[in-house]
């Protein structure tokens, strides 16, 4: 039924688990959906701290022991108050200059997720343990990411650096590259943008069409975005990088999402903005995948991770080839 101004009112209907995904993905989708989150009031920092601590604890328990002795971890303090976890997979050559600057999502922990990234990428990872709201709203997290990139540039050439993140980490990855470029820093070799929160105004179509379908994001995240922005305009490119001017420069990028991802539109729109600016950009969409795919439990998740590894290896290898053949 069509409403004024083109709004469509849909009748209540059942959405089955599709037969077009793996059995493992079907099993994940058959689980009860995440309960709707009731965010605290913006002026109640103690309640926000308690909610964040509970989320962090759940993720730490889920990730415990996944990396084991396959990596070594060294913590580094950054100017301004942030920290970097340098994670090196076992057996990596000491002379290997490749570094993946990993920016975790809003609900993740520094070393737990990044250890898996280091193993999958077979490269050294610098994971930014950035300051977060409610105690440190915007631009603290972005400041810490910039400080990490500056520290990394002091040790590695930019063409050996790839920056990546998922969800809020995808937001910060894109925002960091825009800010670094605006401040005259060299661009990294490439960017990995996995289901990025590219538009904090939630204007994209999927924020309506996938409402109730995404198993990980049960509803709007606007309250947490407002907490992070601390009164700043949500449409600013450093908050909503979709609004950045990509014609001024941006590295090649890979973007990933799924058809049930609440941030499907954020990802698709960001990919289109990059392509309009002439930036090489790949877009990979998983059938029926929600925010974060199938939580790492299905073959579809591994396919996406292999695509990311291929993309990173391609861009790191291109640098090696140019160094070996300077006439090219």
Sequence positions of predicted segments:
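A glycine/proline-hinged amphipathic helix-loop "lid/cap" segment
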Residues: 1-92, 320-328
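Short strand-loop-helix active-site module centered on a catalytic nucleophile
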Residues: 84, 101, 117, 138-200, ...
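Short beta-strand element of the alpha/beta-hydrolase
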Residues: 96-106
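Short amphipathic alpha-helix adjacent to the substrate-entry channel of hydrolases
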Residues: 111-128
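Hydrolase active-site cap/lid region
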Residues: 178-235
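Short beta-strand/loop motif that positions the catalytic acidic residue
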Residues: 249, 255-257
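Catalytic histidine-centered segment of alpha/beta-hydrolase-like enzymes
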Residues: 289-300
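Catalytic active-site module of serine/aspartate enzymes centered on a nucleophile-bearing elbow/loop
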Residues: 298-328
């Amino acid at each position: 039924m069509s409403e004024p101004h083109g709004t469509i009112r849909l009748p209540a209907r059942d959405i089955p688990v599709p037969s077009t995904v793996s059995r493992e993905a079907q099993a994940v989708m058959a689980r009860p959906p995440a309960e709707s989150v009731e965010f605290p009031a913006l002026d109640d920092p103690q309640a926000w701290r308690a909610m964040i601590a509970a989320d962090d604890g759940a993720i730490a328990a889920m990730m415990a022991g996944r990396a084991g002795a396959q990596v070594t971890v060294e913590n580094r303090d950054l100017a301004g108050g942030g920290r970097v976890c340098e994670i090196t997979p076992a057996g990596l050559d000491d002379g290997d200059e490749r570094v993946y600057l990993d920016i975790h999502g809003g609900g993740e922990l520094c070393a737990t997720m990044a250890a898996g990234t280091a193993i999958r990428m077979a490269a050294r990872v610098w994971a930014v343990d950035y300051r977060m709201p409610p105690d440190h709203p915007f631009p603290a997290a972005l400041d810490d990411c910039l400080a990490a990139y500056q520290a990394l540039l002091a040790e590695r050439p930019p063409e050996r650096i790839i920056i990546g993140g998922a969800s809020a980490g995808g937001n910060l990855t894109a925002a960091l590259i825009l800010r670094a470029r605006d401040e005259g820093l060299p661009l990294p070799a490439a960017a990995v943008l996995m289901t990025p929160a590219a538009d904090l105004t939630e204007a994209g179509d999927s924020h309506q069409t996938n409402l109730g379908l995404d198993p990980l994001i049960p509803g709007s995240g606007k309250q947490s975005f407002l907490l992070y922005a601390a009164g700043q305009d949500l449409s600013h490119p450093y908050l909503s990088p979709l609004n950045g001017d990509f014609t001024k420069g941006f590295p090649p990028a890979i973007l990933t999402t799924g058809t049930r991802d609440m941030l499907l539109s954020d990802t698709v729109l960001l990919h289109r903005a990059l392509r309009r600016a002439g930036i090489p950009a790949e877009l990979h969409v998983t059938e029926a995948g929600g925010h974060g795919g199938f939580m790492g439990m299905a073959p579809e998740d591994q396919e996406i991770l292999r695509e990311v590894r291929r993309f990173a290896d391609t861009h790191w290898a291109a640098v090696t080839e140019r160094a070996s053949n300077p006439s090219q």
